[in-house]
Design a protein with these regions (language model features):
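Charged alpha-helical initiation segments
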Residues: 1-66
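Amphipathic alpha-helical interface elements
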Residues: 43-131, 217
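Charge-enriched, short contiguous segments at helix-coil
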Residues: 141-211
Length: 226
């Protein structure tokens, strides 16, 4: 296929493929320069990585890959809740984790008020992996933005209602299946995710949500030139 396309068209196709797979190293290498649509994604830029993850989730929905969409909510949820704690509650929750970027509670570091909050709900608190339900409990006790707390509660409820079923059982995950188990449509769920992202400034420009559409239009334009 490479021989049949202009270098720019092929660059864009490779960029789109790498982007949809969240392969930033490859995407950054083949990305057309100064293209006005996408800029390089660096792993240390957490908000940009999360925004690209959100766009990839939107792509899964558009492709009808609902099981993948549901499974992807869990890691994204914990990421978002950590940022909410930092920005809305002024708590760097990672201070209570084991070192080396592990999402595991550290018995020596998790002390004081945060441990008290977790013990109230999960007595006796057993440490181990960090779950969104743990972070939700802290947000409910420490954040004053009631609407944000409500949205986070909805998000964690959705995750808990569908995660285990979709992960451990052979089921056909459809929009109807999701609505039946969560009370929310796929669009509702994505709207909640977008709301949280915008509140914590993961994305501040609404047109950025159409980035994949802009990229696809550019690809079509380049292919039409060939």
């Amino acid at each position: 296929i490479k021989e049949d396309l202009s270098p720019v068209a092929y660059q864009w196709l490779e960029t789109a493929d790498a982007r949809s797979l969240l392969d930033w190293t490859r995407m950054n290498r083949v990305l057309p320069e100064n293209n006005g649509i996408i800029t390089a994604v660096r792993g240390e830029n957490e908000k940009k990585v999360l925004f690209e993850y959100m766009l990839a989730l939107d792509l899964k929905v558009k492709r009808g890959e609902y099981a993948d969409f549901i499974r992807a909510i869990t890691p994204l949820g914990v990421d978002l809740l950590e940022i909410v704690l930092e920005q809305s509650c002024d708590i760097d929750i990672t201070r209570y984790y084991k070192r080396n970027n592990q999402r595991i509670w550290d018995k020596n570091r998790l002390v004081g008020e945060i441990l008290d909050i977790l013990n109230q709900k999960f007595y006796p608190f057993r440490y181990g992996p960090v779950y969104s339900a743990h972070l939700l409990e802290i947000i409910q006790k420490k954040c004053t933005d009631t609407l944000m707390v409500q949205r986070i509660q909805e998000l964690v409820n959705i995750e808990q209602n569908v995660r285990n079923v979709a992960a451990h059982n052979i089921v056909s995950v459809t929009p109807e299946w999701i609505k039946e188990r969560t009370g929310k449509s796929v669009d509702d769920i994505f709207w909640i995710l977008k709301y949280v992202c915008e509140q914590v400034k993961i994305n501040t420009r609404k047109e950025n949500w159409n980035s994949y559409d802009s990229m696809n239009k550019r690809i079509i334009d380049e292919l039409d030139k060939d």
